[in-house]
Every structure is written in structure tokens, then in C-alpha cells.
């Protein structure tokens, strides 16, 4: 997920917070877990069926209202409880119809999308699905002003049912990746009889959609999903899923090793992953690994001294030692990254930071710091912040501090700071932090979602930085009129080769100006017991429960 509703600061808060695995909050969760409230819904399926699948995770859930949710776990639930107009073919990034019956018909000016709607679909409460129900779902997503509402609100002019089973969407301006955006998990159909439209009118513990599973229990420590027997599509391979929300990676690790959970899904620490991989090689269980699209990076606040000086930002970029970081901190479980666009976009990814700065280029870093006026008696002082409880980022910050101390002759002095994640993301847009270590999980599978949220600024200047817009919300306050123009151009360009050229220019700007420093790209790890088959991590990072079978 990413960060930004109408107010960009809220966007940042959510996008990043959903990717932080644990914090001091987890201690509190452990203490109150037995007191958690739960909501149950009647279901014909048995609660004690031995073939049900139990999935354990440390991911947190705040709400399951698709108009307001913006966390990783809620997104995965929507993939399994709901359907969208479009999805991706399993095992690929090919766009296929889901609640639509064909790809959209797009007008010559790129502003009007006409979409045929599937017939014979029912919601979990028995309400019939049609174009009017899809209009309701998309309108509510925009008008209820939840955290992800900007995704459609900034782009869509109107959504109308132009037939009982035909939908017409008009855009404010053309966007080449709009069809991909419609795969965003929160843009699922929801029952008009259960939900209502209105600013802030959310149902945080309710979900009534059209997907293969229906929610029958919602609690602070567990959720229960039963198969929807009237589902229009292929039926799941299991009778239902029990989702256990565990308070820490240690609890997830131990629960899996003792067999209390069938599948361990996000997030484990590197040492725990290495231990479980060893067990998989000994055939105790299965390990499923895939290249993730999540990027990890360092934000540099250009309004904060000394990071307002380009030479200082470039010196930090020169100092970064990604191979060592991957070896020592991440235990080889990641991929060194040299752009904000992940390597999975092979035709668009440009390793611009490798070409311009390399790794561990300490001599040139010292030259730039000296040129900027710093010395051992007058060092550049930079604070590196990270969310409390992020063990990996704590170690990365310590590594960067050690590299500066050992190799930069006192020219750069790094101080490590940590703060609770909710506070960090709330204050990011206020310019409170000099630099921050964070990550990004995209909303939809298009390279635009790794560039526009970082480099675009709707109001600002080169001298004053970004006053309103994406880069302000990210905490870099980067402003470039050229970048703004290129982003607007790539969003409207439908020719793949021309779009590729534009993305190359944008990545060059990223490397030249250094508002962010890409560090690594995650690999996702999931582990399953030997009685479990069908666990698949999709290239788009969706985790579907339907194929999982317990023998």
C-alpha cells in the first residue's frame, strides 16, 4: 500500500506503517490479546473442520473497510474476500477481467473507460451484483474520504452505470496505468445494503463482498474465513481459513515450529528465516521464497541542514555499501537496489545509483564533504531515524554510522534516533526528521507507483522545496518542475518505448538530486507444514488462500 489520501501526510502514515512488522506496540498486544473483541457471523461451515488451514502472521489490522484500510494485511484479506473489476493472471502480471468480462474500451482521448460487467454474481448477503453496485462501491471509496481515497479521487471525474451490466468511468485527465490501478485490492465490490456513502462512515469490523471467502469472525487476535458456497468462480481447495494474528516474529517462529500454524506468512527476522530454511532443506517443512516488489530506501530531507546541500546528500549516497548491508544485516535475503523502481520492472529499471555512485566510494565522499565546507572539527551532522521495533533498520542505521566513523575521517557524524511508527509517519510531512529509513509496497503493479509518489510536487519551488504534494508527504520536500512535467507526460503516454525513455530520465533526476537513496529490494518468505500444498506467492505480491490444501 502506499501513503497518501487527500491530505498527503495521512497517505505517508498509512503506506509505510502497514509495512512495519513489529514495535513496542507488540508488547502491549501480547498483554491484551486475551481481551480482544471479536465479531462473529453465522456460517454453515464447521468451526472444527480438521482440513481448515491456519495461517499465522505478525501483520497488524486496523480496519477491514476497503474505503479506509491501507495496510498490508487488509489488502491480502480483500484479495480473498472480494473481487475487483480486474486482477492478474496467476503466476504472471497479465491483466485479466474479474468482475468485468473484458478489458475496458478506452476512448481515443484516454478519458473514458467503458467496462462490461459480469452477470450471475451475488454478494455474501445475497444481494445481486450489477453495474449499479459497482458504481456504489467506487463512489463510496472516493466520497467516504478514507486514507486511500486519493487513488481514485485525484483521477476520476465520474462513475456511472450506462446499462444494467455496463460501467463507464470518466477521468479528469488520461492515465496510461488506469486499468492496472483498477486491480488495487480495495476497489472491490461491496454490498450496497450493508454499507453507506458519507464522509467517515466506515465499518471497520465488517466485510460483505463477492469473493470466494466470507468473513465469519473478526477479532483482535484472529479472523475466520469460510468458503462462500454461492461464489461465481472457482471454489477454494480448502473449507476455510483461520488467520492468527501473532504479536511478534518470535511467536510466529515458535508457533510454526510447534505446528500451531500451518503457514507462516510475514514477518520473520533474517536469523529466523535462515533457521527455517535449514529445516526445509532437512525436509521438516516447505520454504516458499519469491522476489518482492517492496523497496527499502533512505529519505533525505532537503529542507534540513546540512542535507540542503547537494554535496552532502551525494556524499551519503557514495558511502552506502549495499553488498555489505545485504551480507551482514539481511543475511543475503535481499537484493541490492540502485533505483526506486524495483528490478521486477526489468525494462524500466535503471541502476542509476550504481552507475553514478557505486558502493563504498569513501574517497569521493570525503572530497564532496570537504568541498561543502566540512572538516573533522566541523563535521556534517546527520540524524538517521527509523520506526521503533524495526530490527533490520536498527542494524542498517548502525552499519551506516560505523561506515562513516571508520572511513570518512570525522567529516560526517551520524546520530541514530528511533520513534514509534505512528508518530514518525504523522510527522514526516512536517519536516521533523533529517533522514529516515523506510520501505514502500506499491498500490498497483506499474512503475508509476514507484516514481510519482516520491518525486511529484503540486506546489513549491526549487529554493523553498515542496510545500504540497507527494514529496512533502514522503519527507524529502523535493521539488523539480522538470520531474513534474515528465511525470505528467509518462502518465499519459501509452507507447511503451516512449514511456520507458521518460522513466529513464526520471530515474536520472533521482540520482542527480538524491532526495532518496535506494538500499535494497525485499525477498518474501513463507513457510508451510508438509501437509500443506498450494502456497503461492504471486509476482504482484498477492497471497491467495484458495489454492491452499491441507492433506
Question: What is the role of each PLM region?
Answer:
Residues 56-108, 139, 208-209:
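N-terminal lobe/hinge region of extracytoplasmic solute-binding protein
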Amino acid at each position: 500500500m502506499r501513503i497518501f489520501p487527500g491530505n498527503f501526510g495521512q497517505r505517508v502514515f498509512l503506506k509505510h506503517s502497514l509495512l512495519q512488522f513489529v514495535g513496542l506496540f507488540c508488547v502491549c498486544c501480547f498483554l491484551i490479546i486475551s481481551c480482544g473483541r471479536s465479531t462473529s457471523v453465522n456460517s454453515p461451515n464447521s468451526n472444527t473442520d480438521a482440513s481448515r488451514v491456519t495461517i499465522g502472521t505478525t501483520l497488524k489490522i486496523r480496519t477491514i473497510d476497503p474505503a479506509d484500510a491501507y495496510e498490508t494485511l487488509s489488502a491480502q484479506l480483500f484479495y480473498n474476500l472480494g473481487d475487483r473489476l480486474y486482477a492478474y493472471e496467476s503466476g504472471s502480471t497479465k491483466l485479466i477481467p474479474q468482475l468485468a468480462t473484458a478489458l475496458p474500451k478506452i476512448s481515443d482521448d484516454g478519458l473514458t473507460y467503458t467496462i462490461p460487467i459480469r452477470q450471475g454474481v451475488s454478494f455474501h448477503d445475497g444481494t445481486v451484483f450489477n453495474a449499479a453496485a459497482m458504481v456504489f462501491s467506487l463512489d463510496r471509496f472516493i466520497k467516504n474520504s478514507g486514507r486511500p481515497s486519493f487513488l481514485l479521487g485525484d483521477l476520476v471525474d465520474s462513475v456511472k452505470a450506462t446499462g444494467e451490466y455496463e460501467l463507464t468511468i470518466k477521468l479528469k485527465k488520461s492515465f496510461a496505468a488506469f486499468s492496472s490501478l483498477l486491480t488495487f485490492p480495495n476497489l472491490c465490490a461491496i454490498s450496497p445494503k450493508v454499507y453507506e456513502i458519507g464522509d467517515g462512515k466506515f465499518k471497520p469490523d465488517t466485510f460483505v463482498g463477492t469473493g470466494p471467502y466470507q468473513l465469519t469472525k473478526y477479532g483482535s487476535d484472529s479472523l475466520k474465513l469460510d468458503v462462500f458456497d454461492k461464489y461465481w468462480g472457482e471454489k477454494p481447495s480448502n473449507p476455510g481459513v483461520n488467520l492468527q494474528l501473532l504479536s511478534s516474529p518470535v511467536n510466529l517462529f515458535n508457533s510454526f515450529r510447534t505446528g500451531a500454524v500451518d503457514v507462516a506468512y510475514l514477518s520473520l527476522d533474517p536469523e529466523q528465516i535462515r533457521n527455517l530454511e535449514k529445516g526445509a532443506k532437512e525436509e521438516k517443512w516447505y520454504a516458499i521464497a519469491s522476489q518482492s516488489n517492496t523497496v527499502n530506501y533512505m529519505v533525505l530531507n532537503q529542507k534540513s541542514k546540512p542535507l540542503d546541500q547537494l554535496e552532502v546528500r551525494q556524499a551519503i549516497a557514495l558511502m552506502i555499501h549495499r553488498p555489505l548491508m545485504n551480507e551482514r544485516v539481511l543475511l543475503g535475503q535481499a537484493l541490492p537496489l540502485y533505483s526506486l523502481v524495483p528490478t521486477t520492472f526489468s525494462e524500466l529499471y535503471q541502476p542509476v545509483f550504481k552507475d553514478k555512485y557505486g558502493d563504498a566510494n569513501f574517497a569521493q565522499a570525503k572530497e564532496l564533504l570537504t568541498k561543502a565546507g566540512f572538516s573533522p572539527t566541523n563535521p556534517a551532522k546527520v540524524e538517521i531515524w527509523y520506526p521503533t521495533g524495526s530490527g533490520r533498520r536498527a542494524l542498517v542505521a548502525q552499519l551506516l554510522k560505523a561506515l562513516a566513523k571508520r572511513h570518512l575521517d570525522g567529516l560526517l557524524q551520524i546520530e541514530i534516533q528511533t520513534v514509534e511508527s505512528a508518530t514518525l509517519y504523522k510527522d514526516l510531512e512536517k519536516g521533523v526528521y533529517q533522514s529516515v529509513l523506510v520501505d514502500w509496497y506499491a498500490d498497483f503493479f506499474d512503475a508509476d507507483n514507484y516514481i510519482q509518489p516520491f518525486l511529484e510536487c503540486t506546489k513549491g519551488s526549487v529554493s523553498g522545496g515542496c510545500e504540497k504534494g507527494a514529496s512533502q508527504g514522503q519527507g524529502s520536500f523535493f521539488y523539480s518542475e522538470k520531474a513534474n512535467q515528465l511525470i505528467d507526460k509518462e502518465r499519459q503516454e501509452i507507447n511503451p518505448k516512449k514511456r520507458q525513455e521518460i522513466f529513464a530520465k526520471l530515474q536520472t533526476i533521482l540520482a542527480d538530486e538524491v532526495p532518496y537513496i535506494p538500499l535494497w529490494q525485499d525477498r518474501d518468505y513463507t513457510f508451510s507444514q508438509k501437509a500443506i500444498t498450494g502456497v503461492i506467492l504471486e509476482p504482484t505480491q498477492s497471497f491467495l488462500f484458495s489454492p491452499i490444501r491441507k492433506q
